[in-house]
Amino acid sequence: MNNKYFFQNDDLGPFQPSSADIMLRQQLETSLSKFFYENCDRKIRDLLSVCRWYVTTHTSAMTLVIECPDQVTNWRILQKMVPMASLLNNIASSAKIRVCPPSSQGMPFEMRVDELSVYREDSA
């Protein structure tokens, strides 16, 4: 009897991106970051300039990560979540924002741009 084995995609090992895949992802993230920053208003740009921030596409959704240097900046960034989410929603409807307070000063806050209507009602 001749047995043949058929593998499902789930049975295969994890996908290892090639160096070209990694480079293309980095270029995409750089372009998305530049587009986002250039379309922010001056107040948001000023806030971002004192933070470490970047765009990542490693998960199923594009994520804007903002690491705040202090609690005051963290609070100001949180107050600008709605306009930043609106801008990201124009780029990708599955995007999210993660705001990270300084180390050991709280947990990151994460918002999906598809939740925008909830936050708009609260900020009105």
Per-range role (PLM):
Residues 69-70, 102:
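Structural motif
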Residues 72-96:
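Short, non-transmembrane amphipathic alpha-helical segments
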Residues 1-44, 50-58, 89, 102-110, ...:
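N-terminal presequence-like segments and adjacent domain-start helices
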Residues 62-68:
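Short, aliphatic-rich beta-strand segments
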Residues 96, 107-124:
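Helix-rich interaction surfaces within compact, conserved domain-sized segments
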Residues 60-62, 93:
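Residues at beta-strand starts and edge strands
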